[in-house]
Structure formats: structure tokens, C-alpha cells
Amino acid sequence: MSLTAVRPRRPAAAVPAPSPTPAPETPRRPRRSVVLLVFVLGMLSATSSLATDLYLPAFPQIAHDLGATESQVQLTLTAVMVGLAVGQIIVGPLSDRFGRRVPLLIGVAVFTATSFLCMVVTSAEMFTAVRLLQGLAAAVSAVVSRAVVRDVFDGDSAARLFSRLTLIVGLAPMLGPIMGGQLLLFGPWQLLFAVLGAAGVAGFALVYFGLPESLPHSERVRQDPKATLRLFGRLLRDPAFIAPTLTMGFSFAMTFTYISAFSFVSQSEFGATAQQFSIIFGINTLGMIIGNQVNAALITRMDTPRRLIAGLLGATASVAALGGLHLTGNATLVTVTAVLFVMMFFTGLISPNATTLAIVSRPTSEAGSASALLGTLQFAFGGALAAAAGLTSTGEATLGSMALVMVVTSLAATGVYLALVLRRRSVSLAAA
């Protein structure tokens, strides 16, 4: 037997035990700057928001030109909400399977085309149909924007980015009616949709050149329709998701009631012009932006659920005051505007925190579906419940009907969240 000489081994150097790696604040940062990401996503979301707000001052003019009633014109706004609701439930799973970028490009292209189609409608029915299709297209931007945030950020970082997005999106409803009112001085209401079409073209260019794919192929989920339905079922049974989602739905119904009804209320009951309405609407939206910035400042001082509860309680108190003004006969354009400003301030606390709690409760692979279900319920509640403000004897929204729907929906938002959170805590204590 031959022996092979073996070089004596050096004693192995002691390898220190790996120290636990702290969880990064942002799991994956995009190659592009955060500023560019916020701008692109904000532009997309703002364009979708302009689809609902830019033409609000033109409601009376549209009703006259199309030979429609006020409720028929309001129905065109509801059609957008229905499109947003249905579209999101479809787009969410598709974005989890095929990525974010391609569905977004298709959605923005369809949004642009329908914006130009709105310029040539000849009846309220045709207008409503095109607006429904436009809402379906706008749903893509709404879903994908939230999903991209979840792809890139987590926890407080996601909350900060949602706050920044809400700030940008908040500028759209503030500037939209003002822009719409001023544009009406230079042309008919069709000009407003030409502007929307131009914004769609700009949004397409921003996505194509400035937004890389944020969902890697390794994290994409290929599900059949049955698996998607099972996922939605799990989401609906998860208190961590459904509590903020239902809260967001009822809260949006409160806000959307104001958005859809106040154009007629301010101009019919208080004698405001289209330009005056647009300025008042912008002032009230400024309240939401201020509330959003206060929310961002409170992130390190107060946890997300408490910020959400503070917003819910404040909004409920505000709309209760609006109802009180109506019942006591003290409602004037000034007092109503002041109360609505406070209500919108607290809405700035509700939206980003409810969105954060709902989306961050799910893993990245389910972010698109979770975002879709959140958006679907949000716009379904908004479109269905806000329409109740027009269910009066004349078929027109009044201050009283608007205030009533806003009080009911704000109470529902607060009650649902508190009930589900308390139930979840009691179950956790029982399990412990």
C-alpha cells in the first residue's frame, strides 16, 4: 500500500457567527431615483383623478348641450367609478402575473383614446358609455401605482411614499376644477377632454421612458381564475386587510358624495358661478393636502392605526357639523366651505394610512391583487353610495341629501374599523 503525503492543515481560523442582518427600510430600491418614481406614479394617479374632477364645473353646461338632466350628468361620474371598480379587480391579478409596466402602458393608451372620444359624444347615454370605458382604463394606473410602491418599499417607507403620492394626487382635485373653470372661459366643455387626452399622451411617455419594471419574473404569480378567486376570498377573510379596506371604501363614499354633489349644490342653492365653485373646491382640497403633510410629520410620533382613527373621528365630527348647519338654517357658502375644508383635512389622514395598512398586510406577490380589491371596493362604495345624494323628489342633489349621505358613510367608516380592530384584538388575546 502506498501512502500519499498529505500537507498538514493549518488550524482553521475562527469564523465569527454571522450577525443578524437588520431589516432594511426599503427592501429593494429602484435604480432610478425615488424622486423620479414619485413623479411618474404621481403623474399617473393625478391624471386618473383629473378624469373625475376636471369637468365638474361644466356639469350644468354639459346637461344643457346634451339635453340631459342633472342626475344623468352625475351618472357619467358614477360610470367612471364603476369602471375604476371593475377594472381594478381585473388588472390586479394580471399585473401580478405579467408585471407592472406592460399593463400600465396599455391602460394609459386606452385612457388617452377615450379622452378624445368624449369630445365627440352626442348624447348622455353615449357619454356615459365612453366614461365607463375611460374608468376601466384609469383603473390600471390606480392599481399599478400602489403595487409598485409595495414592490419597492415596506413599512414606514411605504407610508411615506403613499403620503407623497397623496400630496401629488391631492393637487389634481384642487387644480382640476380650477383649471376646468378657467378653461371654460376659453372654450366649450369638450376642451376639458382635449386636455385630458394631452395629459394621457404625457403619461404614456413618462411610463415608457421613466418607469422600469418593478416586479421581477421570479416573483410573478401565475394563477388560474379559480386561484385568483380563492386569493380574493382569503383577503376578504383577513381582518388585517379587510378592516382598512372597508374603512377606505366608506370614507371614499363620503368624499365622493361631496365631489359629485357640490357642483350642483354650490351653483343651484348658493348661486356660485362655475369659476367660484372651482376655487372653493380647490380651497377644500388644500385642506386634504395639509392633512396629508401633517400625517407624514406624525409618522415617527404616532403609529399608523392611531393616525387612521384620528382622521376618522375628525371627519365624522366635521360632517356632523355640516348636517347641523343645514338643520339649523345656518348654512351659507362660507360656513359650508369652512366645514368641508376641515373634513378634507381629516381625509388627508385617512387615505394614506388605510392604504398602507391594507397593502402592507400582504406579501409582495399578492400586492397587485390586494391593491385591486382595495380599489374595487373603494370605488364601488363611492359610486353606489354617493348616487344616493341624488335620490330626492326632484332627482337633484341638495345640501340636505349630501350631508345625510356623508354623515352615514363617515359613521360607517369609523364603526367598521373600530369594530373589526377590536374583534381582532379580542381574538388575539383569547389565543394567547
Predicted regions and their residues:
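A late C-terminal transmembrane helix in Major Facilitator Superfamily
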Residues: 357-396
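Cytoplasmic helix-loop-helix junction between adjacent transmembrane helices
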Residues: 130-171
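Helix-to-loop junctions at the C-terminal end of transmembrane segments
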Residues: 88-99, 291-305
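Conserved MFS/SLC helix-loop-helix module at the cytosolic interface between two early adjacent transmembrane helices
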Residues: 86-124
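Juxtamembrane intracellular "pre-TM" segments in multi-pass secondary transporters
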Residues: 22-31, 212-245
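Paired small-residue
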Residues: 110-117, 125-133, 334-342
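Helix-loop-helix hairpin linking two adjacent transmembrane segments in secondary transporters
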Residues: 126, 163-209
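Helix-breaking motifs and short loop linkers at transmembrane-helix boundaries and internal kinks
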Residues: 65-67, 99, 120-126, 271, ...
